[in-house]
């Protein structure tokens, strides 16, 4: 079976814009569409997670507008990112999907569910929270501090943003970043500074927005986070889970924003049970 490191990059026309995506996994009636995080391109998905899901489901991951190999520019709002995601999904001829949104992607997934509820069967929202509050409007400062630490120490910013600076967290960060480089051919275009700034503005705008009425999202949702998330506090994730009428919550111990990657084996078991409607 094709794995993430070998999956070919394809494109599809979405209202005149070429969207880059990759697809793999076994055939299933409802594919799982992956929505990625701040400053991420296709190559930034953890192969352990994406291959683990693809062993049981058809998986589709894509670069949203203005990101990586996809054309145009990054939208000004997370809401518009959701609109673009809907357009991409429909351009593939899909009528029903499961969504896996990590971080910013979790916010985009919520917008998809709010704008096109009939399109979404189930959602996994990891390392994310709802619009409005939760310190999300401070994201520029949080990211800036991490980038400064990374520059001084010559490390990847995700070592500071995604994982706690404990021996266990540092080891998990090293393993995670190594996995991201398993793919050596047909790699995506690098994330541009312009796109990074645009995404940060959209996230800050979401943090300052009025809260959404999440009670209208009736699809089953699995909310996951680490107990030491610096970017989206686990309490904010828990608040989101409480406001979703059909949600379950799991907080992974001794982990941060990337808790689902640090605890990828446990998370995969939880996610697959959830997608199979067996609980999580």
Task: Describe each model-derived feature in a short phrase.
Residues 15-71:
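Conserved HGGG/HGGXW glycine-rich cap/lid loop of the alpha/beta-hydrolase fold
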Residues 60-100, 269:
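Active-site loop/oxyanion-hole signature of alpha/beta-hydrolase fold enzymes
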Residues 101-105, 109:
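Gly/Ala-rich beta-loop-alpha elbow adjacent to hydrolase catalytic centers
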Residues 114, 121-153:
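Flexible "cap/lid" loop of the alpha/beta hydrolase fold
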Residues 156-208, 212-213:
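Conserved alpha/beta-hydrolase catalytic His-Asp/Glu region
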Residues 217, 223-225:
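Short beta-strand/loop motif that positions the catalytic acidic residue
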Residues 228-232:
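Acidic catalytic loop of the alpha/beta-hydrolase fold
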Residues 247-280:
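Catalytic active-site module of serine/aspartate enzymes centered on a nucleophile-bearing elbow/loop
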């Amino acid at each position: 079976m094709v794995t993430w490191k070998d999956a070919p990059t394809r494109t599809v026309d979405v209202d005149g814009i070429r969207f880059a995506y990759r697809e793999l996994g076994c055939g299933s009636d409802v594919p799982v569409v992956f929505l990625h995080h701040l400053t991420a391109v296709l190559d930034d998905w953890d192969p352990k997670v994406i291959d683990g899901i693809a062993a049981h489901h058809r998986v589709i991951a894509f670069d949203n507008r203005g990101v990586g190999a996809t054309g145009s520019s990054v939208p000004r709002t997370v809401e518009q990112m959701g609109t673009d995601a809907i357009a991409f999904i429909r351009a593939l001829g899909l009528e029903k999907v499961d969504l896996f949104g990590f971080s910013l992607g979790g916010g985009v997934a919520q917008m998809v569910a709010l704008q096109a509820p009939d399109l979404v069967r189930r959602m996994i929202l990891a390392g994310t929270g709802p619009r409005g509050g939760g310190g999300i409007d401070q994201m520029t400062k949080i990211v800036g501090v991490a980038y400064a630490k990374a520059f001084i120490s010559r490390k990847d910013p995700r070592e500071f943003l995604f994982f706690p600076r404990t021996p266990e967290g540092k080891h998990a960060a090293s393993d995670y970043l190594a996995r991201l480089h398993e793919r050596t051919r047909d790699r995506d275009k690098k994330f541009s500074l312009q796109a990074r700034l645009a995404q940060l503005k959209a996230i800050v705008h979401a943090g300052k927005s009025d809260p959404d009425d999440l009670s209208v999202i009736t699809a089953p949702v699995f909310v996951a986070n680490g107990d030491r998330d610096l970017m989206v506090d686990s309490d904010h994730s828990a608040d989101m889970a409480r406001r979703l009428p059909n949600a379950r919550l799991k907080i992974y111990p001794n982990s941060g924003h990337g808790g689902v990657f640090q605890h990828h084996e446990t998370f995969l078991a939880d996610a697959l049970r959830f997608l199979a409607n067996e609980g999580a």
